[in-house]
Amino acid sequence: MTSEDEREPIFERIRGHEARDVIDERQKFRWRHTTLLNDFHDLQDIHELDTPHATERTQQLETQGYVFEVERRLHHYLSGLYTLLQQQRTLQNGVGQSFGEDLQEVKNEYMRKESSRAVLGLRHYAQHENVLPLQARTSKLERSKSLVVMVDDLHREDDDRDFEQHFGHITKPYFDPSEWVIDNWPDVEQFFEDTIEVMEQQAEEEIDELAQLSEEVDELYEQLAEDYRELQEE
């Protein structure tokens, strides 16, 4: 029969094991990514709606609430992306300093992308101004619609450096923010996967050790069940 003295040390080791924090934070990061993925699909769905060109298209779009709904979904996505980036920063500082440098490089790699700079610039603007200055743009030639922002409209007072950093590489006077989000999504996915990979590689020994301890606990529970059956039979 398994004694309590034999069981207690392994339970204590599991409760205080350093890999538990890594696994918990990794799971939170996965949940945040899943939520962002859902926000991305919501934005992608409305962006791909077949809304044909029509007379007075701007007025028709506004009447249908299309502009408002795109703005709402954009704002939701941009907020979620910022939260994902902030959560990765927490992983750098809160799970183990050994992660800090490598996770920062993962973030830096994402931030170097032109589409990342533009998308995060939109988030920065929306954070301060609440609403993106979307305008309906139609093309009679292509018989299509899109919602765009004029680059100059994103220029906030006293933010010349931030404006150049986020939008200085855009050559046209306007752009479709939803298209930039969609183009940027593969880089978001890479950022997420690289973050997970860094955590798993650097904490591999600790995670494996915790998994081994968990297996030993399962075996103990099986032994306890067997001990209980023996007692019932006496």
Predicted regions and their residues:
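Short, hydrophobic, well-ordered secondary-structure elements
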Residues: 69-92, 120, 124-127
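Acidic, Ser/Thr/Gly/Pro-rich intrinsically disordered interaction regions
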Residues: 1-71, 100-234
